[in-house]
Amino acid sequence: MRALLDTNIVIHRENVRATNLSIGQLFHWLDVLHYEKIIHPYTVSELRKYSDKQIQSLYDAKLSAYIQMKSIAPQTAAFTNLLNDAPMTDNDRIDNQLLCEVYCGRADILITEDRKMRVKAERLGIADKVFTINAFITKAVSENPALIDYK
């Protein structure tokens, strides 16, 4: 299984200070359930836009921990027709492309904290494949109670 991680998830994980205390549990469950943690080329580009060179260097050093997608899925007419009313800022274009990767089946799930992306996922019929950090943890725990470590 392949879990595509939105830029905000990578930032939560690799930040110098904790910004979401559930991020460790998310990565624990991704590992326990043998998900490949993949990132999109657009995520790499976004992380390299940071003006703080020290933060940018930190992210560059940690990106090798993820599998980077080598190509970008073409957006089909069916896909774009479902989203044609969405405003097209640079962030919207990136979000739409990440959703397209799931829509096209190149990733099994997408994990994001972006509410707008989850709304778009509903329009695309892939809401069951787009999770927040806590929603994925809840699903993992409820579907795999035998794997919970109660220590």
Residue spans for each PLM region:
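Acidic, PIN/NYN-like endoribonuclease modules and their adjacent C-terminal/linker elements
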Residues: M88, G105, I109, R115-K151
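Alpha-helix capping/helix-boundary segments
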Residues: I9, T43, Q97-L98, K116-M117
